[in-house]
Regions:
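A short, N-terminal "cap"/entry segment at the start of jelly-roll beta-barrel domains
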Residues: 2-43, 56, 122-180, 184-187, ...
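Asparagine-centered strand-capping/turn motif at beta-strand->loop junctions
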Residues: 103-105, 233-235
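A short hydrophobic beta-strand segment most commonly corresponding to one strand
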Residues: 93, 107-125, 223, 237-255
């Protein structure tokens, strides 16, 4: 965004990008943006704005844009929809052709993770809507304008493992997973596709290739390049929630399947 000082993270696509480290690099009350991940489908932009940061309403005519919300509270007014206040763990979508006006409203800084097209720009400006209509009335996921983490926890509860497909479009699939400590998934790898996660709550241990496992917590991002085997386990004493970002047509090769090809990157 034009009104944010844009810095490229020291190294893009780190195995773990720590929430505390990125926030620690910038003054609390300043607008800034960093690009921690470029996965071939998306440019992922970590954006901070203190309340009062001027909006920059604009339109992307040929791709959908979405955001994972972190610290603070951010108000989205998308297309003709009524404004929505989004907070930690929520996902917002601006469908192609829908103007979006984004305003940080609460917290010392409001943090959002923008998942945008690599060639995104703000050249086409939006105008205020001439009327407002309710958001997502009577609709179910995926691809709600606003996926509320609070609502998901009320719907699914916290007494079981569950998954919710939040976004499925031509570029991305965003899957929300709630898991109990000790839950471990089968090890697999994906051809031709980088993959990453945003940890929303709890602690998750990521075992990637033959490297030492790494543990990530709330607000951290974890990145795995295509062709690299990995599996995850929730650790600690409380459930974890993560958002997994992949291509829509994801292919799994399981390492315990004797007929599956071996992972080229281990």
């Amino acid at each position: 965004p034009e009104d944010h000082e844009m810095t490229t993270a020291q190294t893009k696509n780190l195995t773990v990008t720590r929430h505390a480290e990125i926030l620690g690099r910038h003054p609390v009350d300043s607008p800034w943006a960093e690009v921690p991940i470029e996965d071939g489908r998306n440019r992922v932009v970590w954006i901070s704005g203190p309340p009062g940061t001027p909006p920059d309403p604009h339109i992307h005519p040929n791709f959908n844009e979405c955001w994972i919300i972190m610290d603070g509270k951010t108000r989205y007014q998308i297309g003709q929809y009524e404004p929505v206040d989004a907070e930690w763990g929520d996902i917002m979508i601006a469908p192609a052709g829908f103007a979006h006006d984004i305003r940080p409203v609460e917290g010392k800084q409001a943090i959002r993770l923008g998942i945008t097209h690599p060639d995104s720009n703000h050249d086409i400006k939006g105008v205020p809507p001439s009327r407002l209509i309710p958001v997502d009335t009577g609709l179910s996921s995926p691809n709600l304008i606003h996926t509320s983490m609070k609502r998901l926890l009320e719907t699914h509860g916290t007494n079981s493992n569950w998954k919710e497909l939040a976004v499925l479009d031509s570029r991305n699939r965003l899957l929300i997973t709630h898991e109990f400590p000790g839950t471990e998934n089968r090890r697999y790898w994906h051809p031709d596709m980088d993959k990453w996660w945003a940890v929303i709550s709890g602690e998750i241990e990521f075992s990637i290739s033959d490297n030492e496992p790494v543990t990530a917590g709330p607000g951290d991002l974890v990145f795995v390049p295509g062709g690299t085997s990995h599996n995850l386990m929730t650790v600690g004493n409380k459930p974890s929630i993560r958002i997994t970002v992949t291509a829509p047509d994801i292919v799994h090769h399981y390492t315990d399947d004797p007929d599956a090809p071996a992972a080229p990157n281990g």
